[in-house]
Amino acid sequence: MINVRNTSRRALLAGVSASVFTGACASFFQTGDDTGNSELRRETLRTMKRAARFMRERVAYRGGYVWSYAADFSRRWGEMEAYPTMIWMQPPGTATVGHLYLDCFHATRDEFYYQAAMDVAEGLIAAQHPAGGWNYLHDFAGEESTRRWYETIGKSGWRLEEFHHYYGNATFDDAGTSEASQFLLRLYLERRSSRLREPLERAVRFVLDSQYENGGWPQRFPRVDGEVEYAPYITFNDAVADENIKFLLMVYHTLGDERALAAIRKAMEIFPATQQPAPQAGWSLQHHHETLAPMGARTYEPLSLATHTTAGNIAQMMDFYQWTGERRFIERVPEALAWLDGLRLRDDQVQVQGRQYPTFIELETNRARINHRRGSNSGSGEYYWNYDVRRPITHYSQWRALNVDALRERYNRLASENRDALLARSPLNAQANFRLPRFFTTDTIDVSDLNSTVGAGTTERPTGERVMELNSSLNAEGYWPTPLTATSNPYAGEPPAAASEGDFAQTLVGDRFDTSPYVTQTPVTGISTAAFIQNMSSLLLSVDSGE
């Protein structure tokens, strides 16, 4: 699963001056680096337009996108195989492409890209739930087609339990709602189009209406009968609160909406409220929405405390101290750090190099709960946990790499910093002439697409040699041919009751009835939305005029 956005949008949360976001990255064509001549710039602009036109005219379906496509469009995938009438919300999906088009518009001032971004907005508006959020995917063929997909392909993805049932509501999971909301806000601010105002307001209301009085947010909203037990739990997993707070900060600073500021202040309260007593002073992936007790979720997310969630929440608590100057937000940070220190594995205990902290920690005993599975598909298979570190599942990390020392250093630094200086830089203060970052897709973006390394790090301004390579590698049709290393089994019908022969305990996919994506050793060449985003992000930096 995913945690989206860092760098400049993370800086937004830290209260960095707005001037950080308005500075431009000069292109090498202006600075004279490498082979930055005017002809290469013109060629690069042509490459960008050809690639964008192909995606807009040949690949998009009603303005939206999935993650990858067979070259002949015979198959296509989001996190799972998709119907031709579907678009995908999780990054790097529809809204990510919308951000890219808007980034290209900022870099080139070419109206083509603004109109392409508006096409994406139309797709998102059509896919928007009446409550204001988005599901993982949307099928323009209608509810019957959507339900058929969930009852076949979705239900058959053994390790993707979130797709086993369709509830007809929206989700905060995997940042799909957050990214779509941020994109609509960015695009609205460009020209204040009346077409976007009401969908944007619905997106804002979705975040506000779904927030509990205690400040937390559920994974899914609105509540529906029959949904999985964990759907209403307060969710820290996949940075749900972090993403919502970021969006609300953007709304507050750009639209002056005081509702957003009130919701941010309320959201901060759920973090200290759910921190567990010492000596286990951590957090769970999710907590009960009424009792605030730690809770489990998917069958490979057992009732436990989670070390990576704890590290993330420690960082958030320190953010809140920076924003408010209220020491109550950091007074129990040392307890949480001490708990993590006690969980660090000795070198001879490490199972995965570089990962020294077990993911799931049992309440009271402090023992690591390790997840396993048996069977061969979603029908015959099951997940279970025990304390045995041998043969764990591999699709969900059972150990984490955490930089606890860096958290402690930050705490010590903040504890001695002048409170007035912190408050002066707080993002909770209204800022005159505030502007969002010019570019979004050049930031770090973590995604679930197995085909992609897009967003693995901040995109750097490319060399002239790299620009020429990208220009020349765009094929005659207008896309960058990409090995589709992720694939999936086509839906093969209901699985038999008995498990198939074979050992699937540590694989990404089970038998032929399992529709979960996996990495193939014989990839076909196709069209990758992530590759399009990554390559275009590099090229737009090379031609950016800084205006």
Regions found by a protein language model. Give the residues of each.
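Well-ordered alpha-helical scaffold segments within catalytic/enzyme domains
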Residues: G32-R41, A95-E111, E179-S194, E243-D257, ...
